Amino acid sequence: MPAVSAIIFDLDDTLYPERQYAFNGFAAVAVKFKEWLGDPLEAAGAMKRLFDTEHRPRVFSALLAERGMAQSDVLIARMVETYRTHLPTIHLHPDADAALARLFGQYKLGLITDGPAISQWAKIDALRLRTRFDAIIVTSELGPDCAKPHPSAFELIAQRLGVEPPECAYVGDNPAKDFVAPNALGWTTVQIRRLDGIYLNSVAPRGGVPRFTIDALDDLNGILSRV
């Protein structure tokens, strides 16, 4: 089996804490819509609280309901737009920053991330990642059905990096979707378990169990030396 020559990373909760982005977005929404939501600090705090409940997929709708406000599709759409287009202040996990510095030049590096393109590129730019990867793919730019676990982004990034599937390793955090495609393609798969990760306890579907699990990216070199 060929040695790994390319490492492809997930972004959210793999390289930086996704909560940082979400909480930045809630603050932006709270400020812009203070006429409807009241005190921005209180409103942002309410959204942060709802984020850690079953209301996470519909925080804005739940917030309006808590306040006894009508479920205005127009208002919610504007809140979502503000959230997705805000310019975040976010930071890499220290081990991610160190790993990228250590691996750059030793391996070809790629990034695959799901989500609205405008949001994901804003994150990438806030983290100054464009020059730290040899190839970056935002799956929503490939088509509406190309998010993980669809294999298209994985196949494309291997082509762009000029490597064969057995030479690829993929590092992600979410077993519910991250590892199905790279497992099927014959990649080495590694889950990073972030204790503050949103999807830490997600269950892997059939074919989606990662080959390796680590608690810090400092352990990645040791894993790859065993492949």
Regions found by a protein language model. Name each.
Residues 54, 90-93, 114-117, 148, ...:
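Short alpha-helix boundary/capping motifs
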Residues 24, 28, 46, 59-62, ...:
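Alpha-helical elements of Rossmann-like donor-binding domains used by nucleotide-donor carbohydrate transfer enzymes
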Residues 27-34, 61, 65, 84, ...:
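Class I S-adenosyl-L-methionine
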Residues 81-111, 118:
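Short, acidic loop-to-helix structural element flanking the phosphoryl-transfer center
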